[in-house]
Amino acid sequence: MKIQDFQDNVTCGGFDNIFANIYKPQDIESQKSRYMSAVEKFTALYPNRNDIHVYSAPGRTEIGGNHTDHQHGCVIAGAVDLDVIGVAAFHDENIIRIKSEGYDEFAVSLDDLDVHIGEKGSSEIVRGIAARFKDLGVEISGFDMYTTSNVLGGSGISSSAAFETLIATAIDSYYNNNPVSYTHLTLPTIR
């Protein structure tokens, strides 16, 4: 979707049903402002990108079994209305560039998806997800993305999992037409 079309739809209520499925009614106007701000920041960072895709991935609360999933146990989780949103433009430059609000931009070359000893954080997550899609036979050619999150890191509502879900959703929806289950995707990305 063109940036101006996205902004017009947000302003004129064209996405209100989508916002109503994600957020509480009293939060829709503030969320619309949040999305508009994210698109503006994306445009400032990547001024030559005009076709965008916008994604949301929720945080989660673990009701039972907290952290047992890290040892292949089971957990009962529920989504919360805090999320990370991403504005992305896909391209054929064979690189993923991501700028998250409050953090420096980083890049992951799709020509180098091997494990990097000592690499930690978001670039490690993105590299692992891209490697998993490659292992599944999905051709990825790259994208630029701006993210903003109200899922606070270290708060116990899975900010890293929300970021991972956001990236996997963007890749899966654009390059793979959504056929992969998240369980199938995320477990092997932990390398």
Q: Where are the predicted features?
A:
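Conserved small/polar residues in nucleotide/adenosyl-binding loops
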Residues: T183-T189
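ATP-binding N-lobe of GHMP and related small-molecule kinases
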Residues: K2-A161, T165-V180
